[in-house]
Amino acid sequence: MPREVLSILVDNHSGVLARVSSLFGRRGFNIDSLTVSATDDPEISRITIVVHDDVKVLEQIIKQTARLEETRAIFPLNTAHSLLRELLLVKVAADEANRTAIREIANIYKAKIIDLSIGSMVMELTGRAGKDRRFSGCAFTL
C-alpha cells in the first residue's frame, strides 16, 4: 500500500489532537507518523499525518476527518511533488571505549551529535524514509 500524507488545518486549542487521533484509532486506521505545529495564525494548528492505506480507505479518512468540528481544511499531499524527510533523535550509551566508533558511524550517516555527556551521546539524523531505520539498526546500546 502506498504511503499517503495528509495535512490538516485545525483549531488551535486543547483536545483537538486527541479528537483527530482517536477518530483514526476508533476506525482502525493506523497512523505511521504524526506531527503537530503552529501556523502563522495563532488560532490554527497544522497536523501532518502519514498513513499506509488504499485509496478507498484514504477517502474515508479524509471525509471523516473533515466532519470534525475543529477541522478547517484537509489536504492530501502529492508525495511525488513533495520533499518528505524524517527526523530521528537517538540517545546511546557512549563511554571512552566506544565513543570513537559511535562517531565514525555517525559520520557515515551524516548524523549530528547534539549532546555529549560522560556516559551517553544524543545524535540527530534527518533524511529520506529508511535512512533512520538503517542508522538505528546499528549496534548501539541505548
What are these regions (language model features)?
Residues 1-45, 50-142:
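Long, contiguous binding/interaction regions
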